[in-house]
């Protein structure tokens, strides 16, 4: 199979010096050049995605000054690159949510969007249903399919005289959308208008089934009568009770149950009810993700085992790897039992397919079967061009023969609903009775692979998808030959001339085919003898993860008969989704110092990190300890960190050491939607997950003694770094205003070089309203970090039994935002101008003397905080005049990812990373080992390189380096 790697070669680069590059104005729409700060290694990383293209697109926006800038930690974002900086005139320029911190794809109504559970929804149905969906997508970096929650669904009116592009592939796959809608090809993303007949597009070859809604309760509390009340409490906390048909989690549970009936065991172990699954390590890792999505923890055990087997032909020995995934939660084990999982040895138990599965909508049955075949179904195999039968073999004690047959007949009846006919027959076995269900024949196998396929086993799944694409391709060739047969017959009947009959179809078939059709009465055309075998097809057309390249055979420009286009935005960094089978496309940091040294803290580091983990809520969807209703957070949005201090979370002087004093003037809570407030209210005072963290660090190197002294830093000192932002509220604000701006952009006639690069005039009603909402989100983030600071101080007091203020000296060094837009005054061509600076994944870096810097730091410059990746160094830098002159007072914000989170989990194991860090003297406490794997040091660029570039460029000055000794992560 092919590994797809997208390399951007379209954007020219001119080297200025060792660490500066220029993107010349190669496109006449560019108003300014691009400026990139990177060494040779970092620039190559940027060439591999759309970073440079996005920087060039930003240079086309109205009112931009000097350069479109990319910092050394830059990588592809949404519209703007992450690590991007741009300044726009406040009168003539624009404002863009994508340039402040956000990560949309326009398609025709009727387009089928594939979801996690293998059912599809029409894109126009998504606005009502997207909150419940996770969509399938193609993770290019990893080369496999993945899932993402939907950030938003946007729609826009089709402009007068606007046309759409419709493309059709060789197997009949069709997609229709606006000219500038990007689709994935083997060469990277290409706009629909640039696709030509004969080009290839990347397809996810899975048909799925339509969504069918069913309402009602499957299981409620009454099913657990007599059980410990803690069981019900546990399930309710995870929204697993009551179980309703309309909950998408039903698809996940059906998949898990299917796999459990194949390769699972429910039984007593050491007096406890335990649920265990068996299989290959990579299969169980996929299953573990599903369990974790339900809030169920599972432990994976992998070990090598020596084996020795005696057979009639000889004795064999070797090593095999055994993997087991164990769920110790009695509550979940009981739930799965109630859903139909038998307790004890399955071969000794009589059971049927659960009634709720038999009565479920087709999409639920699909998930059950895919899980079951993922465990016990045979992988699809071919002999040349012909698929061999897919088998499902089951065994039971002889006394349960009738029950075994009934069980397989249940499976057969469900399969028939998908157009899959089967045969069931007995297989000879010595100790038990064994029956086999077989899917035989090309049409049945094609229907199985295209509508059901396998789940959990990546190898089975990928091969099954490519096999389905092959069988579709084969069928399309046979259909074309059938058509040639009919044409040649008709012409021969009309003319009696075989030469004419052959001439009409010679581009499709050879003369011998026409002769067989006319003289021998051939009725069922076969593929030609030189037709690709499956293995050849997989090698030439198959991509990792089961994706396939299909040739485009028809491209049309059409006048839409509908009045709207639709877009979907996803959270995943891949920024795509699967439509009709085709792949289409304020955070901040705070540093708190202490009077403690490593010698003081090292003996208590485990206790300290555990206490921080306990006192500061963290993890996916984590909720704060403060309970505010969404109607009560307006004061937070207006006053930011000041609100938190007024409520007792910190000291009045804290506000002097925060960017903007922890509060941006002009925030308007009425500009923030109810949905955003509902998402933010329960998360206030929480860390979140992903790359957000609390880190206990030691200052291990001072580069500038004078500035370090001004910042209160000394070698050997213990400090705490906090990285978190505005949580779900900020993301929702961006989602809301992207939709608003999509509708407004044409009204203002703003150039739109990239559909992701939505913007409106800064002085427009929409622009000002968004700016007010962005300020409110920034204030929420400052309040959030202020509350966390308070709990950090309390944690130190709890562990060291000393007063945070009088004894420990726990002062804030500084707090910087790195996804924000600011109105600032800068010098351009010798004149002072007011601009709206967009910093996306970039940090403000003002020089000595600037009035926006706290008085205590005004002589040395603004502190700049650069977090490294988990287990690597972080840095404190100082703002410089160089930054003011070159980058609108901006510098980098961190290391920048080189592996997606999912790629990191495949390459690293969380427990091994944790253990390795512990050997290096770094204690890690995390909500899950998955998060540790996602944030492995190897998933990021080398922060030392990034910092070296900005230092050499003179856009920040090195002050101090810190190394971690303890990490708390969500």
UniProtKB/Swiss-Prot annotation:
DOD-type homing endonuclease domain location: 256-420
Instruction: Look up the record and name the cofactor or cofactors this protein needs.
Output: Mn(2+)
GO molecular-function terms, A-Z: DNA binding; endonuclease activity; GTP binding; metal ion binding; RNA ligase (ATP) activity; RNA ligase (GTP) activity
One Pfam family name from the record?
A: Intein_splicing
> Which residues hold Mn(2+) 2?
587, 723, 818
Q: Which InterPro entries match?
A: Hint_dom_C, Hint_dom_N, Hint_dom_sf, Homing_endonucl, INTEIN, Intein_C, Intein_endonuc_central, Intein_N
Which controlled-vocabulary keywords does the entry list?
A: Autocatalytic cleavage, DNA-binding, Endonuclease, GTP-binding, Hydrolase, Intron homing, Ligase, Manganese, Metal-binding, Nuclease, Nucleotide-binding, Protein splicing, tRNA processing
Q: Which SUPFAM superfamilies match?
A: Hedgehog/intein (Hint) domain (SSF51294), Homing endonucleases (SSF55608), Hypothetical protein PH1602 (SSF103365)
UniProt GO BP = intein-mediated protein splicing; intron homing; tRNA processing
| Stored PROSITE patterns | INTEIN_C_TER, INTEIN_ENDONUCLEASE, INTEIN_N_TER
Enzyme Commission identifier(s): 6.5.1.8, 3.1.-.-
What residues sit in the active site?
893
Q: Which domain of life is it from?
A: Archaea
Give binding positions for Mn(2+) 1: 103, 587, 692
Q: Which reactions is this enzyme annotated as catalysing?
A: a 3'-end 3'-phospho-ribonucleotide-RNA + a 5'-end dephospho-ribonucleoside-RNA + GTP = a ribonucleotidyl-ribonucleotide-RNA + GMP + diphosphate; a 3'-end 2',3'-cyclophospho-ribonucleotide-RNA + a 5'-end dephospho-ribonucleoside-RNA + GTP + H2O = a ribonucleotidyl-ribonucleotide-RNA + GMP + diphosphate + H(+)
Keyword tRNA processing attributed:
yes
State what this protein does: Essential for tRNA splicing and maturation. Acts by directly joining spliced tRNA halves to mature-sized tRNAs. Joins RNA with 2',3'-cyclic-phosphate or 3'-phosphate ends to RNA with 5'-hydroxy ends.
Q: What is this protein called?
A: tRNA-splicing ligase RtcB
Organism from which the protein derives = Pyrococcus furiosus (strain ATCC 43587 / DSM 3638 / JCM 8422 / Vc1)
């Amino acid at each position: 199979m092919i590994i797809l790697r997208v390399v951007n070669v379209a954007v020219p680069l001119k080297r200025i010096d060792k660490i500066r590059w220029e993107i010349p104005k190669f496109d006449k729409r560019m108003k300014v050049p691009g400026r990139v700060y990177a060494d040779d290694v970092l620039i190559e990383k940027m060439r591999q995605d759309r970073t440079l293209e996005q920087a060039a697109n930003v240079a086309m926006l109205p009112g931009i000054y000097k350069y479109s800038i990319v910092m050394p930690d830059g990588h592809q974002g949404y519209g703007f690159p992450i690590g991007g900086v741009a300044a726009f005139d406040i009168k003539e320029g624009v404002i863009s949510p994508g340039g402040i911190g956000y990560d949309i794809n326009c398609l025709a109504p009727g387009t089928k969007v594939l979801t996690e559970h293998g059912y599809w929804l029409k894109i126009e149905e998504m606005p009502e249903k997207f909150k419940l969906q996770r969509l399938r997508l193609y993770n290019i970096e990893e080369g496999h399919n993945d899932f993402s929650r939907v950030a938003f669904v946007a729609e826009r009116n089709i402009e007068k005289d606007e046309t759409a592009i419709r493309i059709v592939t060789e197997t009949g796959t069709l997609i229709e959308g606006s000219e500038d809608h990007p689709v994935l090809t083997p060469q990277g993303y290409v706009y629909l208008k640039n696709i030509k007949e004969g080009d290839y597009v990347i397809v996810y070859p899975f048909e799925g089934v339509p969504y069918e809604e069913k309402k009602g309760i499957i299981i409620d509390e009454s099913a657990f009568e007599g059980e410990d009340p803690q069981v019900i409490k546990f399930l309710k906390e995870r929204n697993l009770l009551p179980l309703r048909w309309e909950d998408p989690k039903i698809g996940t549970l059906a998949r898990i149950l299917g796999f459990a009936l194949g390769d699972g065991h429910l039984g007593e172990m050491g007096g406890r009810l335990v649920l265990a699954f068996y299989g290959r390590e990579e299969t169980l890792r996929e299953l573990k993700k599903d369990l974790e999505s339900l809030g169920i923890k599972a432990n994976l055990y992998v070990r090598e085992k020596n084996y020795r087997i005696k057979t009639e032909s000889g004795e064999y020995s070797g090593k095999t790897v055994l993997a087991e995934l164990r769920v110790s939660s009695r509550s979940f084990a009981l739930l799965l039992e109630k859903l139909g999982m038998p307790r004890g040895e399955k071969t000794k138990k009589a059971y049927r397919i659960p009634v709720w599965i038999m009565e479920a909508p087709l999409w639920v049955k699909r998930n059950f079967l895919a899980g079951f075949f993922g465990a016990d179904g045979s992988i699809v195999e071919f002999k040349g061009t012909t698929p061999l039968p897919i088998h499902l073999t089951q065994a039971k004690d002889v006394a349960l023969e009738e029950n075994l047959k009934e069980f397989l007949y249940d499976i057969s009846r469900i399969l028939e609903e998908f157009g899959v006919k089967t045969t069931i027959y007995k297989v000879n076995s010595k100790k038990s009775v064994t029956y086999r269900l077989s899917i035989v024949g090309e049409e049945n196998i094609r229907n199985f692979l295209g509508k059901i396929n396998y789940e959990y086993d990546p190898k089975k799944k990928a091969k099954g998808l490519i096999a389905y694409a092959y069988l579709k391709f084969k069928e399309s060739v046979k259909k074309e030959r059938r058509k040639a047969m009919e044409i040649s017959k008709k012409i021969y009947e009309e003319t009696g001339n075989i030469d004419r009959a052959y001439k009409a179809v010679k581009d499709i078939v050879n003369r011998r085919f026409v002769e067989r059709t006319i003289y021998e009465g051939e009725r069922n055309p076969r593929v030609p003898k030189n037709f690709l075998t499956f293995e050849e097809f997989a090698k030439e057309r198959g991509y990792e993860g089961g994706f396939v390249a299909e040739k485009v055979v028809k491209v049309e420009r059409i006048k839409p008969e509908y009045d709207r286009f639709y877009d979907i935005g996803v959270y995943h960094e891949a920024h795509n989704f699967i439509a009709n089978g085709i792949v289409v496309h304020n955070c901040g940091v705070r540093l708190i110092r202490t009077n403690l040294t490593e010698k003081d803290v090292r003996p208590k580091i485990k206790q300290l990190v555990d206490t921080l983990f306990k006192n500061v809520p963290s993890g996916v969807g984590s909720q704060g300890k403060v309970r505010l209703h969404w109607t009560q957070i307006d004061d937070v949005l207006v006053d930011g960190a000041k609100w938190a201090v007024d409520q007792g979370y910190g000291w009045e002087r804290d506000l002097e050491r925060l960017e903007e004093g922890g509060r941006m003037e002009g925030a308007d809570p009425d500009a923030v939607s109810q949905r955003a407030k509902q998402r933010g209210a329960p998360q206030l005072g929480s860390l979140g997950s992903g790359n957000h963290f609390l880190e206990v660090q030691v200052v291990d190197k001072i580069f500038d003694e004078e500035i370090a002294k001004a910042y209160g830093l000394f070698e050997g000192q213990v400090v705490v770094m906090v990285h978190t932002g505005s949580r779900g509220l900020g993301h929702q604000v961006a989602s809301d205003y992207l939709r608003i701006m999509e509708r407004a952009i044409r009204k203002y006639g703003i150039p739109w070089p990239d559909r992701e690069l939505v913007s409106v005039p800064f002085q427009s009603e929409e622009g000002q309203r968004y700016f007010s909402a962005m300020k409110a989100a920034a204030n929420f983030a400052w309040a959030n970090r202020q509350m966390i600071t308070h709990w950090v101080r309390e944690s130190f007091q709890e562990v060291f039994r000393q007063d945070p203020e009088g004894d420990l000296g726990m002062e804030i060094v500084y707090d910087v935002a790195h996804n924000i837009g600011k109105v600032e005054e800068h010098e351009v061509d010798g004149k002072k101008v007011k601009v709206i600076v967009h910093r996306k994944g970039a940090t403000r870096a003002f020089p000595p003397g600037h009035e926006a810097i706290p008085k205590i730091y005004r002589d040395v410059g603004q502190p700049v905080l650069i977090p490294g990746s988990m287990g690597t160094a972080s840095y404190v830098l100082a703002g410089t005049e160089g930054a003011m002159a070159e980058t609108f007072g901006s510098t980098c914000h961190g290391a920048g990812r080189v592996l997606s989170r999912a790629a990191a989990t495949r390459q690293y194991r969380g427990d091994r990373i944790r253990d390795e860090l512990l050997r290096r003297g770094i204690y890690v406490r995390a909500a899950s080992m998955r998060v540790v794997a996602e944030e492995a040091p190897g998933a990021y660029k080398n922060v030392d390189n990034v910092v070296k570039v900005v230092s050499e460029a003179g856009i920040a000055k090195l002050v101090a380096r810190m190394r971690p000794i303890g990490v708390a992560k969500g």
